[in-house]
């Protein structure tokens, strides 16, 4: 049975000191969570603090990006070996902000996904359409292109270590949210596409999160949908009390 996972994406927020304070507040709030996975995606500068503060807890740590290469003359970049050395377990790849601001395409993202898997890191592959694409009725085409491109040469066996996150770009940080029915419709399409690519057994076991203005008020209704297996949470993951509510909604749905 696939796992419900609630992941936070801090983006370019929180110093190491602020991260330590956050985890000291979050840990007691979610200590009794047994069924849902908990992940925090932290900026590179806070990763060492994050892995140290969560050691021995039920919280796992993700990087928000990485370079596909192990080392070399890539000024300003961080490699999978560096992330592993810090105790990071997951890495968020293909986020719409990386696609838009840093011009990452499916080919670049695919190289990162394959590199993460080769270095025993679990990629959280983000996919999703822009508002004009939804209005043009091309949501499924966009999502299919991103999944097929992002997972090129990824084997069925490796899919056990891949998480997908559907984030409609028009709902990220805008306060707009896909309705539970809208989100479920796309998640069901994604599940069907994974079935076509890898077979039903693999598809049924892949965690597909919803992202896009998920918060403590709407999380339970979204996660209750058949094919929504948790969330990738932005702004609400910066506040321990709000994030804990979302985590507990995921935990309740996972029982």
Residue ranges and their predicted role:
Residues 1-255:
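Active-site loop-to-helix "anion-binding N-cap" substructures in soluble metabolic enzymes
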């Amino acid at each position: 049975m696939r796992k419900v996972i609630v992941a936070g994406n801090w983006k370019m927020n929180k110093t190491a000191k602020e991260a330590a304070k956050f985890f000291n507040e979050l840990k007691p709030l979610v200590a009794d969570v047994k069924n849902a996975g908990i992940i925090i995606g932290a900026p590179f500068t806070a990763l060492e603090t994050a892995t140290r503060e969560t050691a021995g807890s039920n919280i796992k740590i993700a990087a928000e990006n990485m370079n596909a290469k192990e080392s070399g003359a890539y000024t300003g970049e961080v490699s999978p070996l560096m992330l592993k050395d810090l105790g990071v377990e997951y890495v968020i790849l293909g986020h719409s902000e990386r696609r838009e601001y840093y011009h990452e395409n499916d080919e670049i993202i695919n190289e990162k996904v394959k590199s993460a898997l080769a270095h025993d890191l679990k990629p959280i592959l983000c996919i999703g359409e822009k508002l004009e694409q939804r209005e043009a009725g091309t949501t499924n085409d966009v999502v299919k292109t991103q999944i097929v491109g992002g997972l090129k040469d990824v084997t069925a066996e490796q899919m056990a270590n891949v998480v997908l996150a559907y984030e409609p770009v028009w709902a990220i940080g805008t306060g707009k949210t896909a309705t539970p029915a809208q989100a479920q419709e796309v998640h069901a399409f994604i599940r069907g596409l994974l079935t076509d690519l890898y077979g039903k057994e693999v598809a049924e076991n892949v965690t597909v999160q919803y992202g896009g203005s998920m918060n403590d008020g709407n999380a339970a209704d979204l996660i209750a949908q058949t094919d929504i297996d948790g969330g990738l949470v932005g702004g609400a993951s910066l506040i321990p009390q709000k994030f804990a509510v979302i985590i507990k909604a995921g935990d309740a749905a996972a029982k």
